[in-house]
């Protein structure tokens, strides 16, 4: 009965006009952003964080989440039509999506990716509905030592499973933890790592850090590697989007396997949608009777990875909401957004603020339905967005970032922080240092320190409490 009452309350919140508007705006913007190679959901969410300060918390989180999973839908469009992934998670879709487009089946490829994305996302929303409350019920009894262990596991997993060197991942986590300790020690009042800057007394801004590392860095890197001209793309009509009965039959099993793989990867910290899509593609190729056909434009090659990456995106909310442990960089920014709005993520969110939790889940259902309705009839309109000159788009985004970060505290120092971390972010991209573990370390580092201090206070300095509890 409690489940039904929470379900009804959440549906009522999600169906409020303001929240419907925020949900629609989020998924529509996410779709557009996903189509534009090099921008991505992470930088967009980072840029829009200042805007959400003036919004009601539930609506703000609904909109930001809509951008995240909406970008997965849009990312496949660029992969199929231009052989350029709109987001990293859609990279594997290029392998068979673009050959399908060259074979005259671009419409079928786009239609199929939209349908399987909806199925994969819906599957993970069901998991979120049932698993997150169960995990939260267990985690509500956690004390400081258990929280320390869970946070430490999340940091280590994120660093070791990140793309590239494990050593680089661990190094970035360490740097993130150190950056998270900047400012006054809350227990002693002693300033730490301020280097004489009074503006750093309250610590570094999560918005400035995220905007610099993921917004400015990506824009600068893309400006360095493109000429700013718009892409040449095929036109797509509504009639060409419908797959045949044989296409649906062929794609059914790969879609089921893909959404299961994606949901599992989303729950595990550090894996995420990119690994899920590649793993599902590799699985289908291994199980296929004709593996040599992969890469030539077959429906299985797009159905499995698209179902996987959308399932992964939705299931990534399970550890973030129920434990307060983000699995990737986007979830870390979402965690920061919750904190900015005074919402403590973790088991208390699920058990003590069920209206927010269930309202968010119900908005996922509505958002997925919006995406299905948007991406099928309006795909021809969305494709035209790819013809926007990139140099003008990027310059406008840089101005928006600076105005946004300044508006938070009316402090010019934050703009310098954004610029500094933007340059650092470009250097990290060139050196292949993953930025996501750094952001995770920045967010979770203070939580790790606080729970370690509490545990040692209870045990009177005995470190064995972390082993025996």
Set out the residue ranges of the language-model regions.
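Helix-loop-helix hairpins and the membrane-proximal interhelical loops
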Residues: 1-60, 133, 191-298, 383, ...
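N-terminal alpha-helical transmembrane segments of multi-pass membrane transport
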Residues: 1-62, 103-112, 117, 121-132, ...
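Transmembrane alpha-helix interface/packing and boundary motifs in multi-pass membrane proteins
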Residues: 27-41, 71-83, 158-163, 259-269, ...
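Short helix-coil transition sites and intra-membrane helix breaks within transmembrane domains
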Residues: 33-42, 80-91, 123-127, 265-274, ...
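Re-entrant/interfacial helical elements at transmembrane boundaries that shape
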Residues: 41-51, 64, 79-99, 130, ...
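Membrane-interface alpha-helices at helix entry/exit sites of multi-pass transporters
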Residues: 58-62, 99-116, 288-302, 322-325, ...
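A structural-propensity feature for long, helix-poor, extended segments
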Residues: 68-80, 86, 298-323, 327, ...
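Membrane-embedded alpha-helical modules
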Residues: 111-227, 340-468
